[in-house]
């Protein structure tokens, strides 16, 4: 089953609150949705999702480009208005988006993990990347747009990226993009609404634990690199603000914000 790509609004069956905008091609689904939020006469409804058959300038973390063969993968962005989330706690949004992708892919194969902060891996290979863009309103998150690219049916990757993999390469089967999108949106919606109702913070704590359990290279010593060079360390923790905590061979704890440390793959 393939998408019929047109620039129009539809809805996912049985989920009328999830409007879908399907595009044949765009430079970036994140940029398209952000422009829609900023310039449309009325802001798009929460959960509005833009999906493209092809992106000409898809971006991931660290400014990396995202290679995707037209029509072979799942490329989309969705919008949330999580004004109930304090800016200092915004990492929880990255956690629930990452978990929703991971758990949807878990239904198709084993070995799926989350590479901090939010890449999705199958063993040592990258199957999904995302770019989450937040807009602040005072000390709250006024808008969150996660942009996600999942490698589904592409079997040849020509970019210099070191370790891409698709679901088809893993299992040998073709996959239906609307089915996987629907599954992701349902999972994200469940997490998001539970977070909205989380008055005592217990749900956020449970999410942090689930996220930690799902992390790539959760056990053992592994190579990393920071501004001072390469070193071996084990994963110790991820703090509520998203800081990555490693324990090196000497037992010293090292804390990093995003882009301050890299995995050596």
Model-derived features: positions:
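Short beta-strand segments
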Residues: 51-53, 77, 115, 131-133, ...
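Conserved RNA-binding domains used in RNP assembly and mRNA/RNA metabolism
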Residues: 173, 218-265
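Conserved, helical-rich catalytic subdomain that frames metal- and/or nucleotide-binding sites
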Residues: 172-228, 236
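Residue-level signal for inorganic ion chemistry
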Residues: 29, 76, 101, 119, ...
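Acidic (Asp/Glu) carboxylate-rich active-site/surface patches
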Residues: 97-139, 149
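N-terminal lobe of the biotin/lipoate ligase/transferase fold
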Residues: 1-107, 253
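Short, acidic (Asp/Glu-rich) active-site segment that either coordinates a divalent metal cofactor
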Residues: 139-169
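A generic structural motif
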Residues: 53-55, 121, 133, 223-225, ...
């Amino acid at each position: 089953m393939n998408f019929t790509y047109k620039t129009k609004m539809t809805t996912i069956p049985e989920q009328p609150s999830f409007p879908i905008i399907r595009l044949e091609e765009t430079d970036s689904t994140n940029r398209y949705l952000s422009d829609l939020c900023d310039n449309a006469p009325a802001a798009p409804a929460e959960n509005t999702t833009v999906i493209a058959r092809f992106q000409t300038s898809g971006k991931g973390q660290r400014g990396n480009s995202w290679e995707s063969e037209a029509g072979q993968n799942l490329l989309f962005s969705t919008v949330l208005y999580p004004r109930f989330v304090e800016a200092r706690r915004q990492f929880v949004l990255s956690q629930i988006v990452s978990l929703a992708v991971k758990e949807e892919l878990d239904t198709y194969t084993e070995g799926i993990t989350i590479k901090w902060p939010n890449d999705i891996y199958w063993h040592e290979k990258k199957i999904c990347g995302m770019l989450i863009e937040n807009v602040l309103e005072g000390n709250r998150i006024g808008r969150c747009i996660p942009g996600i690219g999942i490698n589904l049916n592409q079997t040849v990757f020509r970019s210099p990226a070191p370790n891409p993999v698709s679901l088809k390469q893993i299992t040998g089967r073709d996959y239906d993009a609307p089915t996987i999108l629907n599954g992701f949106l349902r999972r994200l919606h469940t997490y998001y609404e539970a977070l909205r109702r989380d008055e005592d913070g217990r749900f956020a704590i449970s999410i942090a634990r689930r996220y930690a359990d799902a992390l790539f290279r959760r056990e053992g010593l592994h190579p990393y690199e920071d501004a001072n060079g390469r070193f071996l360390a084990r994963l110790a923790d991820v703090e509520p603000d998203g800081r990555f905590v490693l324990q090196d061979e000497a037992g010293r704890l090292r804390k990093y914000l995003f882009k301050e440390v890299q995995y050596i793959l």
